[in-house]
Structures are given as C-alpha cells and as structure tokens.
Amino acid sequence: MTDKIETLSHATKESIKIVISNFENFSMEKYGKVAIIPDLKEAKEEQVFDVLQAWINWNKLKSPTTVKLYFSHLRKYLHYMGVKLNDQDVKQELTFKHKIDEELYGLTVSDIQLILAEMRYKTKVQYLCQLSGLMRIGEVIQLRKKNLVLGKKNIIVKIPPTITKFSKGRTTFFSKEASRMLIPLLKEMDDNDVVFGSSDNPKFTDIKNKDNSISTTKQALRAAVKKADLEMTYESTGRYMINTHAFRAFGITKLSRHDPNFAKKLAGQKGYLLQYDRMTDEEKLNVYEKYESELTIDTTAKQKAEISQLKTDNDELQKLRDMIQDKDKVEKMFKQIKADELRLKELTSRAEAALTALKKANNL
C-alpha cells in the first residue's frame, strides 16, 4: 500500500491525508479516541458498517460526491490497515446521499459589476483574470509572474502542468481590461512571486499554501457578495449560488456560445478538437479577440472592445469586398484575353488564306 501511495500524485496523497484526518476527528468526537481501527479489526462486520455509516452521516454537510470520494480513499486505507470490505456488502449495508442536480445560477454582468465594486483592487483584478482566462481558482492563485507573457495588450498565460487539474499545461489569455489593471501590480513583483496567492510560505507544502490562498479569496468573495446583497443559496444543499467557480463558468458559457471547442481548450476541459493544439499563440489570440467583448465587464471597456471588434470585422469585410472586386477584374481580363485569342486566331486564319491565295496567283 505504501509503495502504491508513493506512485500517486502529490495532490492525491494530500487528499488521502485529509480523509484520514477527517476520520480521526470523527472517531475522537464519536468515541473519545483517535485510533479506533484496532477496534474495527476485532469487531463484527455489522459493527464495522455501523461505524462507517455513522461516519458518512457525520459528513452530511459535505456534498454527496465529496463523501463518496472520501469513502473511496478511506476504504483503501482501512484495507491497508487490515479492515477489508466486500464490494457487495458495501453496496448493501451503506447508504450515501444522492446528488440532487439543481439548476445552477448563472452570473450576469450586473452581478459581477456589483460584486467587484465591493472588492479591494487586487482581488477585483484576480476575479477579472479568472473570468476572462476561464481558469480554475486553484490555478489562478498559484500563478507566478514568470508564467505570464507580457508585451501585448492581452497578457498571454502559460499555465504550468503542476498546477492544473489534469496535469497538462495550457495557454490562455487575460482580457485587455484585466491585463490593463494587472500590469501595475506586476511591476512590483519578481518573476517567481505568486501573482494573486496570499500564501507562499516555503515552510508549507504547495497544497497547504494553495488551501490557505483559496480560503482567503473565498472569504473576500463572501464579504463582497454579502455587501452586494447577492447571498442566494440552493434549497437542496444550502450552498451559495455565487462562488469562485461561478466566475470561470461565466467565461466558459460566454465563449462556448461562439466556439465551444475553443472554450474547452482555454478552460482545460477534455473533449476539444485537436486543431487548437496546432495553432500558434498568435492564432489563438486572434480567435480570442473576436469574442473578447463577451468577457469584458466594465461598461466603458465593454463598449470599446465591441467597437474595436466591429472595426476589425468591417476591415475584414472590406478586404473580402476588395477580393471580390479584384476577382471580377481578373475574370474580365481573362475574358478579354480569350476574346483576343479568338480574334488573333481569326486574323491568323485570314492571313493564311490570303497567303495561300497569293501563292496560287503567282503560280498561274
């Protein structure tokens, strides 16, 4: 088991540690001691399942998906410690809450404007970057200045595989609105500094620093949402409708309406067409800029982005018109050439006939 754990990703190993800690906290609260696994080894199977069901119920405030993931990790740990569970018995003896799929709340531009108005400058920039870059919150708070490519109006973001969900690096972009606001902050940073993360303590693990930063940014969001009077919750779970993921979802939704495959590529989701892997950053940015106004929040900036894109579209339309006109000119030229060829053939034929007649006359 130890060897198997060592082959797992760092994030998975940290998750297993969290589950073990969770089970120990449950054991202390329920039975007054942390180490109850030796007791489980000696207990009857029915008693073991009673304890596990009590632990599942103890985690009732967590989502059904999270509890099932926790149990998967815990079961492996129990097996390693000598408590083996049969698959059929698990299905028959344990009851998990079913996931209820409520219709998810979609952020509006108005919502975002109200929330950002209640945030400090750096936090506001962070959420604009997450939204326009279609990034997960865990990716945003782990970005370092060296991951950003400057020099254009849109900052190019090179997300390293070490901080992504599927351990695959990717390229995305920040809107001109977000980039313009981020530049002053970057001027005060060294290349290896985290851009938005609040925790970068070398004494902590990467997971610990990540968790601390996520906790801080969630608190900032909750405070801003409360001030904006937008603290709605889902009836089935009591969870807040507006959370950190809502900003990423806003960007994905807006971009997906125009180009769903490109949206998946930028967001790091599976299932996009491989054609985007063959595009240069410049080509990807050109696609991004076509729909950038959809990812712009400030009303004035949004209007500027729309006007800029309209101008670009008009320029492309004019080029197309010019090409059509040029095509017409070329077609007319070819028609004239063909007409000239026919005329030349006719004149050549007449000349040959005249020459033949002249030769005959001379022979007479």
Predicted regions and their residues:
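C-terminal catalytic core of tyrosine-transesterase DNA break-rejoin enzymes
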Residues: 128, 246-269
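Flexible interdomain linker/hinge and immediately adjacent N-terminus
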Residues: 83-114, 163, 202-203, 207, ...
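Catalytic-site neighborhood detector that most strongly recognizes the C-terminal catalytic loop/helix
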Residues: 260, 267-311
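Short, charged phosphate-coordinating catalytic segments
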Residues: 130-153, 261-262
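Active-site/catalytic core of tyrosine-dependent DNA strand-transfer enzymes
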Residues: 175-238, 251, 259
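Conserved tyrosine-mediated DNA breakage-rejoining catalytic core shared by Y-recombinases
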Residues: 142-184
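N-terminal core-binding DNA-recognition domain of tyrosine recombinases/integrases
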Residues: 1-103
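Basic, Lys/Arg- and aromatic-enriched nucleic-acid-binding interface segment
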Residues: 107-137
